[in-house]
Structure formats: C-alpha cells, structure tokens
Amino acid sequence: MTIQLIYCIFLLMKYYCTLKKEDGVYYVAFPDLPHVFTFGYTKKEALEMAREALNGVLESETSRGIKIALPNFISEYAVEVEPNIAFAIMLRKNRGNKTQIEVADKLNISYQQYQNLENPKKTNPTLKTIAKLQKIFDYKFLNHTPQKIPKFKP
C-alpha cells in the first residue's frame, strides 16, 4: 500500500459542553448556549444527544435570523457543528452591518442566492463562491491540513 499526501479542506466549529452525572443519568449543558441541554444514560449517548441538540438548535435559530453566540467556553467535551450550519453562522457573523444585497452585489449574484448561503438548510456554496467570500471578508472559511491517505490500487 502506498501513501499519498493530500490536502483535506474542512470547516470546523466546536462548542464545548459540560457533563454532570446524577442518579445514573448524564446531563449535558452548553455554557455558551444556555437554552441547549439534553441527557443520556451513558457518556457516549449523552454526547451523541448533545450533537443532535446543538445542531438542531443552531440550524433552527440561524435559518430564522436569530443571533448566535460564538463558542468561548472550553472544556473536555467538544461537540462539532455540522459544516453547513457552521458556514452559515460564520458568513452571517462576517457580514456584520453590511446588507445581504451589498454582499450579493460584490459577489455578482442575486440577493436570493446570497440569502441561501446564510440559510443552513439551503447553503451549498461552490469553492469559487467561498474563495470570493474569503476575499470580501478577509476571513478563511475553510482550513486545510495535509493528511496521509492510502492510495487506491486496483
């Protein structure tokens, strides 16, 4: 098996949670998002439920235009945000006080196309669009790290 070096492009956002065991149940809370909480009967189940709860609330609130607190709290338990949700959150944060129409004009796309970029249920930007957004906002939406993967040999 040969190893090939490739670059992995990803968007990563994590919120950290607390786990508290009480009466055989693991309770999960997100200090940065006090209205997001859940539980599980095992640590693994609690963290799976945390991922579902976190992403469900973030997707719902982002698609409705509700401001989202960015992660500040750090603990042992990190919960990843789905890439489409993280992208929509960071795009909205970077837009700041600019209107969607202003940014759409800079991208040379329609206002409705830009609205879809900020909606986690609809966002599906091309790499070209992401590259343009990175220039407009001077912000790296995507990171890349070299990773070794086995090269496929038939």
Predicted regions and their residues:
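Short alpha-helical DNA-recognition segment
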Residues: N97-N116
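Residues that mark the N-terminal boundary/hinge immediately upstream of a DNA-recognition element
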Residues: T42, T99, P125-T129
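Short, conserved catalytic or interaction motifs in soluble domains
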Residues: N119
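Short, charged recognition helix plus adjacent turn
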Residues: N143-P154
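DNA major-groove recognition helix of helix-turn-helix/homeodomain DNA-binding modules
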Residues: T126-N143
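DNA-binding alpha-helical recognition surfaces that contact promoter or target DNA
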Residues: E48, I89, K93, N116, ...
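DNA-contacting interfaces and partner/effector-binding or oligomerization modules
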Residues: M1-G65
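A short, Lys/Arg-rich alpha-helix, primarily the initiator
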Residues: N72-N97, L142
